[in-house]
C-alpha cells in the first residue's frame, strides 16, 4: 500500500524514546488519571485539538499515548497564515505525509486537508504529485468525508493534472484545487463511487465529457452536486458552430448548484428525475434545458430569464420555494409566470436612489419572504 508506515516518519512525529516518557516522570509525583481512560474518551479529547498534527504530539507523553492518536476516527489538517511562507508551508506538507504514514487504523471517517495559501511576497505551490498520495490514502482507507483544499495560485499551474482515484467507500468529496482534475474510471464501467452522496468541485479545470461520464455512470447514489468556478473544456456541439453542451444525467441527484459557473457559455442540459432543488448560474448568457419533474425549489439569481432559452420542459408548475430578485424586474415577472403555484416566495427588493427629485432619496435593499396557504 502506498501509505505504509515509515519508521523515520514516526520518529519525526513522536520525538520520544522507549526508556522514559513524560507521563512516567509525572507519575512519580502524582497519579496519572488520564492515561487510564478508554481509547474512545481519549479520542474525543484529541478531536477537540486544532488538527491531527497537534494530536500526534501527545505521543511524547507515554508509550500508551503513542497508539492513541494513530487510531483517531478523524484526520484533520488545517493551517493558517503563519504557514504561508514557503519553508513553513513545506513543513505543513511534511506533517501531513508523516501523519498518514504513521496512521494505524484500518479505516478513517474523515480526511480533511487545507493547505496554506500563498503569501503576498512569495507563492506557495503544491505540485499535484505531492497531493496524489493523500488521495490514494483516501481511496484505500476513507469511509466518510474527503475535503482537500490547495492554495490558489492565479492559474499558473492549471495544466497540472490531479487524478481522483476510485473511492468506493467515500460518502462526500469536497475539492478546491486550481489544477486540472481527472477521474480514474474503469473502461468497462461499473459503479466505483458507490457510496458517494455529495460532490463539490471548486476552481478546478475539468474535461466536460469525462465529467458527464463520471456523473452518469459511476455515482449511482449521488444526491448533491455543486460546481463552483470550474473551467469546463468541451468541444463544439456538432461541429456546425453550435455552442458546446454539458449534460448532467443522474437518476439519484436531488440538489444541483451551478450558480458560480459563469465562465461556461454553452448549453447546460439536466436530466434528473429526482431533482428537487436547482440553483443555476448567475450568468444569463447560458441556455438551460431542464428535465426535472419533481423540482420543488428554484433559486434564480440570474440577471435574466428567457423562456425560449431557459427551458423547464418536464418540470411541474407547482414550486415549494422560489427565490429571485426585483432588481431583475422583467425576468422575475416572467419567471413567476412559469409556475402556477408557489408556496414560499423569497425575493430581494432593490430601490435605487433617484437624483433628479427636489428632495433626497435613498437606495434600499432588503429581503421579503411570503408564504401562502
Give names to the regions the model predicted.
Residues 180, 206, 230-232, 261-263, ...:
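Hydrophobic lipid-interacting interfaces of membrane-associated proteins
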Residues 31, 43, 52, 317-373:
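Innate immune receptor modules and recognition interfaces
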